[in-house]
Design a protein with these regions (language model features):
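Acidic, Mg2+-coordinating active-site environments of NTP-dependent enzymes
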Residues: 1-141, 166
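Active-site beta-alpha connecting loops in nucleotide-dependent enzymes
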Residues: 128-130, 146-167
Length: 167
């Protein structure tokens, strides 16, 4: 979260909250309900908040998350006001990538897109090179996540490696 500019996670959250102060009351902000500063940020918003994540506070969530044999992830997209889930497939693995997909889905939902349109858009996503790229050679799995690596991306890569070991 660019700590070199803000000094701490609290400083980063305060800077984000300052951005919220400039949104119009009829605007919309999409926030990660899994973020430790979610409650603070949501309380600062004077507009509609669309929350995504695994938290019970999230309106946009993933259900029945699983991997496929092609290196992708499948899940049921839960949207507010919808009784049926929309099946989503993204071409990458890892909970962090599910969270990223949920963020995009929350934006799409906020803009009025249908679950089917969101699924179609997410299916077209292609992961960037050197971001959670999984390859296998001589029985060894390698996760190449060296593009602009930082502690959070390294943690996500290690969590993905642990997940691959269980699957």
């Amino acid at each position: 979260d660019h700590l070199e500019f803000f000094g701490s996670m609290e400083g980063s959250a305060q800077a984000k909250a300052e951005l919220l102060d400039h949104l119009p009351q009829d605007g919309t902000v999409v926030l990660n309900a899994d973020d430790e500063y979610f409650d603070y940020l949501a309380s600062r918003a004077q507009c509609r908040v669309v929350a995504f994540g695994a938290s019970p506070k999230a309106a946009v969530r993933a259900a029945n998350v699983r991997t496929d044999d092609k290196g992708g992830t499948l899940f049921g997209l839960v949207l507010p006001g919808k009784t049926r889930q929309t099946e989503i497939r993204i071409r990458t693995q890892g909970q962090h990538n599910v969270s990223n997909a949920l963020a995009a889905a929350a934006v799409g939902h906020a803009l009025g897109l249908s679950g089917a349109a969101i699924a179609e858009g997410l299916a077209k996503f292609r992961p960037a090179a050197m971001r959670s790229q999984i390859s296998q050679s001589h029985g060894v799995q390698v996760i190449n996540d060296c593009y602009n690596a930082n502690p959070a991306s390294m943690k996500a890569a290690i969590q993905l490696l642990a997940q691959l070991g269980r699957d």
